[in-house]
Amino acid sequence: MLKRRLRNYDINDIKHPEDCEILDGLNKIPFFKGFLNNTIVPIREAYNEVESYGDGWNITAQSSPQIYQCLKEACGILGVKKVPKLTSEWFYAPTSFSAGNENFRIVISSGAIDLFEKEELIFFLGHELGHYICGHKPYQMLLEALYMPFIDNPSVKMWSTIVKVPLLDWYRKSDFTADRVGVLCCQNIDVALRVMIKRAGLPKKCYNEINIKAFLKQAFDFENHHVGNLDKIAKALSLRSCEYPWMVQRAAYLYEWYRSGEYQKIINKYKAI
């Protein structure tokens, strides 16, 4: 399938409403983003660079050309001119994260590279590029810095705990936006859902019988049936301890957005001529 290249798009057309509202509020705090870009961001960039070079496989056009080509393709579709650095680390759960703003680097697990097909990997990389495009990284790196080893002073710990709870709530919601960017990158909702099914725990020996309809049924059953007061309390308490939103929830939110027609509107509106 020939993918449409997207250009001059308004990222606010893509963002999840809750992510957009919180991010706009953070961006309006005077000097806050500038402060982060001059303090927390360089520290996290340096920390990640040292860790990635010292304990990971640096993926380049020379070292791993096929994987690097997936990243170049994702950047080309989304109009990201500066291709970020890419590292693979040994961990078999299919995960990824990114750090940096000016010096942006994506770190992807070896398991993701092994378990995902090419188009699935493009969705996965597009998700991380989405965090970068949307301006999430300074605030995400602030939250990540609060978990770093040097945060051991009691007064700093108390302050960081107050900041962590609302910031972690936004951190999870930012993934809903990044998933949208991911599917705009791979341009196939089934590819995005296959990634989520694999990450949700489908055994590798069942990959040849992935049932997307069954997963979507599970997702919508979860959203529609677990709505009692006790269920709501259990959901809230469970989510507070999670770094990321549940895969089933992410699938439901992404599919609802796709089915609403917003995905196609963005493709039609911002496709390169």
Language model features with spans:
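Short pre-active-site segment immediately N-terminal to the catalytic Zn-binding motif
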Residues: 62, 107-123, 166-173
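Divalent metal-dependent catalytic cores for phosphoryl transfer on phosphate-bearing substrates
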Residues: 141-162
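Active-site His/Glu-centered metal-binding helix of metallohydrolases
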Residues: 116, 125-134, 177, 181
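Hydrophobic or amphipathic, alpha-helical segments that drive membrane association/targeting
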Residues: 1-102, 164-165, 171, 203-204, ...
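Short helix/loop segments within enzyme catalytic domains
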Residues: 62-66, 74, 78-80, 156-224
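Divalent metal-coordination and catalytic microenvironments
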Residues: 71, 108, 127, 178, ...
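Short, conserved phosphate-binding/catalytic loop or strand-edge motifs used
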Residues: 102-106, 157-160
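Catalytic Zn2+-binding segment of zinc metalloproteases
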Residues: 128-148
